[in-house]
Every structure is written in C-alpha cells, then in structure tokens.
Design a protein with these regions (language model features):
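Short glycine-/acidic-enriched loop or helix-start segments at secondary-structure transitions
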Residues: 93-94, 136-137, 165-167
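Alpha-helical subdomain
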Residues: 165-169, 173-185
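A short His-aromatic
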Residues: 129, 133
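Conserved N-terminal segment of class I S-adenosyl-L-methionine
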Residues: 1-124, 128, 141-142, 157, ...
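Helix-to-beta-strand junctions that scaffold the AdoMet/dcAdoMet cofactor pocket
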Residues: 134-135, 148-150
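Conserved beta-strand signature within the Rossmann-like core of class I S-adenosyl-L-methionine
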Residues: 151-160
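Feature marks short, surface-exposed loop/turn motifs that line or immediately flank catalytic pockets
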Residues: 113, 162-164
Length: 214
C-alpha cells in the first residue's frame, strides 16, 4: 500500500495479520483498513448484503436507525432535500424520513445505482452503516462533498474503533464486507480536508456540516 485509503497520507505501517488477512494503519488519521488483495468480489459482496435482514417492517432495525436520524433531524428542516447514500436493498431510513414528511432520494451502487443523483445538490445526506464498506473512502467523500449544498449536513453511523489492542477480536472486523475502520481522529481529519465541521452527538455517530467560507 502506498497511501492511506482514507486521507492519502503515506505514513502507513502493517497493523495486523490474522486469518490470512492483512490490515494497515495510518499514523496520520488513525484509520485501519484491509489490504486490497483481501477484498471479496463484487458478486460475493452483493450476495452478502442480500442476507441482511433489514426489512422495512423490522421495528428493531427502524429503532436502530433512529440513532442517526434523530441527531440529523435536529439540524435540518422538513423542506430540506436529502439523500440516503448506500441505502441497501430495503431503504428503511428513507421510508422513515418520508413518513416524517421529508423529500429524500436514494442511492446504492448495488441496488439503486442511479447516476442522476450526482447531478443534484442535497441539504442532508445520511450514511447508515456504509462507510466501513468503502474500498475508496477518500474518493467517496469527495463525491459526497460534491453532492452537498452549502451548509448541508452529512450524517454517518458506523462502529467507531476504540483501543488498538481490541481490534483483533472485534466482531465488527469479522464481517468480510467491512474493510475500513475509523476513530474520532479519522473523522476529524476527513473534515479538515474539506470545508466541513464535525460533531459527535452520540456513540458511533458523526455529523459533518459543509460551511460557507465565501
């Protein structure tokens, strides 16, 4: 690996080798990520997502999504146009926002690959359990930045890393589609590389605000 896939720093070391997998660490942004040679194929990844039991009628899953929805709704108004980025095959987050009166679009590279969304601007973008799957997070965050209107909010929910020594036995690492892992420091670096402020309103939640510097 030549560069960190999150921040493009060259300050990399091998972090861990386990179960025939190699993980790298960035000494600048503190992200940990899987070596590219260990990525599963597109078809394997899609098959794995189809096993998720994230139906629109699953109340437990809908309650879980409120962990992101509630702090994000505190920052936006009902007439704001939003995007569920990486919505999966059953966009429950979109369904909740729509039932609350919001106008929201969907995008998912596997299930809703509508490229027209990249011609639009949004006042809020929600990514629930998405960023840990990104093979090219630096480039994806550029895409998201381009989708954000001025003063827009971008909400992320993912399991934050804690202590490095816990990583080997962390259940979150064992999902074959989870390839990149973040700390608060990582999200602060992501924000600093763009016109974003970042807040951490609750556990495993990051809210980014695209500020107007004009």
């Amino acid at each position: 690996m030549d560069n960190c896939i999150v921040c493009k720093s060259k300050c990399l070391d091998i972090f861990l080798k386990v179960d025939d997998l190699t993980y790298w660490k960035c000494k600048f942004c503190e992200a940990k990520f899987l070596d590219k040679k260990n990525y599963i194929s597109y078809n394997e990844e899609k098959k794995h997502y189809l096993k998720h039991n994230n139906s629109l009628s699953d109340q437990g899953y809908r309650d879980f999504l409120q962990c992101l929805i509630k702090p994000l709704k505190d920052k936006i108004s009902n007439n704001d146009f939003g995007l569920d980025y990486g919505c999966g095959y059953a966009p429950a987050l979109t369904d909740i926002f729509k039932k609350d009166g919001f106008n929201i679009d969907v995008y998912d590279p596997f299930f809703f690959p509508n490229q027209n969304i990249f011609l639009k601007k949004f006042k809020f973008i929600a990514c629930s359990e998405v960023v840990e799957h990104l093979f090219k997070p630096y480039e994806e965050f550029i895409k998201i930045d381009n989708l954000m209107d001025l003063n827009a909010w971008f909400g992320v929910m993912t399991s934050f890393m804690t202590e490095d020594f816990l990583f080997k036995n962390w259940h979150y690492r064992r999902d074959p589609t989870h390839v990149v892992f973040y700390k608060k420091k990582t999200f602060k670096v992501i924000a600093s590389q763009r016109r974003w402020k970042v807040l951490f309103p609750s556990k495993n939640i990051a809210l980014f605000n695209k500020i107007d510097l004009s």
